[in-house]
Amino acid sequence: MSWKRSERLMDTIKHYSNFPATSVSLRQMVQFGEKPSTGTLFRASQFLSEELPIRLAHRVQELHELPDGLNEMPSICRVRDWYAQSFDELTNLSRPNVSSEVKNRLLKPAKKTELTSKGSQNPSIKPGQYRSAPETGNGNGNGKEAKGAATARRYYAAADDGQEWPVELAAYNTKFAEVLEKIKRRHDSVVTTVAQGILEWKRKKQRMQIDHNIQAFLDRFYMSRIGIRMLIGQHIALTDQRQRSDPNYVGIICTKTNVRELAQEAIENARFVCEDHYGLFEAPKVQLVCNNDISFMYVPGHLSHMLFETLKNSLRAVVETRGQDKEDFPVTKVIVAEGQEDITIKITDEGGGIPRSAIPLVWTYMYTTVDQTPSLDPDFNKSDFKAPMAGFGYGLPISRLYARYFGGDLKLISMEGRDEWTSSEMIRSSQGRTQGNRSMRLKLSGQLGMEVSERRQVGDAEEMLMDKGAGAPWWRSVGMEEGM
């Protein structure tokens, strides 16, 4: 039986959209440890059963209220219904009946508690830049701010594990994780489906580019999606982790992410795609300069995505600038620098550079230098859909959101007229320029080798959004007190 949205459901979603999201910190996510107890995991499940519907409701409302007919595009309506259906499933999931004694145990703090660290503003993000509704001035744009309320709701809250927990709690944890897995699969193709919706709108309106309002919406929407999937993916992994665990992982967070290994893997993947796309015997070579022992706490999947997209961009520029029939291409360089607070990954290529006037367009969704945007086949909305090497104009904008999500940034420096360009991804901040036509810097945030409590925390989508005064965490949006 196919799912259908009802007017009553939409009224409920509208009600939920008035509540602000709660922020979740990276610190809270790793406090679960290798094998979280049934009680601790149950409390986290209860938090998400309340937090995720709020976040989903924000997205449904924003999709429903898109201007200029964009909300009427078939693909946009499809995505809106996915979010509404996921909201419906979460809010209708029945909770177990537990005795008052068990409830008291769940609310009783664990004997051993840890202090959580405070966050800091990401200098790459302007206050309110990713706010859901900038014009409201109310907190994150989704309701009134409730000062101090965040401390009452937390993703990580260790329960008293002095005794065995009822089997009903373990059964609920498993069921909740199954529902999250179903939702995650449903939303796998949201990025490509929204891209299709934008294409539909551009064709109908005969527009060549999207305007600032739609660009801002896409930034907010995709940043929020990163936050939602981060929470869902982490909780699924934590539930599964009780059966099999890796000492270097807490959920999907790797406490010892090896930068060199991920960079080498991204290089190999990007070169393979380049060879396949252009029919080359051998793609341009990539030189990696990185110490073997640089590691830090991060989500490997995020870093892999950023490195792959920027490398793919660089290799394509080199091949198309030099010509596909050239036997020897100039070497693209990947240099990893470790600082006290930042890790900077600089990718320098000789791909011809970009005119200064065109640099802002690089970060615009649906902007591409490919002559013709590839068409999506009828099955583009399936989870196994793979986008082509280039042509949608999503690679760099989405990669920058991933970098900014955890406090870093992705910057492009272009020197037109020379033969190099540098693309650097920054895992935190760094200064410096590259020689050459294009330079991308990926900055990744956090002091390396330190406890999470000593690392700068990053905020999650909804509350980067907040426009609070100095000293207030901008990342509160994810649903926790510290922001992730």
PLM regions: where:
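ATP-lid-like helix-loop hinge signature
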Residues: 280, 313-350, 374-380, 415-417, ...
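Conserved ATP-binding N-box helix of the HATPase_c
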Residues: 269-273, 299-328, 339, 396-405
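Signal-transmission coiled-coils
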Residues: 3, 7-278, 282-285, 300
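Conserved catalytic submotifs in the C-terminal HATPase_c
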Residues: 283-294
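Beta-strand cores of modular interaction/reader domains in eukaryotic scaffold and signaling proteins
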Residues: 287, 297, 333-335, 346, ...
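Short acidic-aromatic loop segments in the C-terminal HATPase_c
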Residues: 363-367
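Structural signal for hydrophobic/aromatic residues that build the beta-strand cores
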Residues: 52, 221, 296, 303, ...
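Flexible, glycine-/charge-rich segments associated with ATP-binding catalytic modules
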Residues: 2-46, 67-71, 95-98, 128, ...
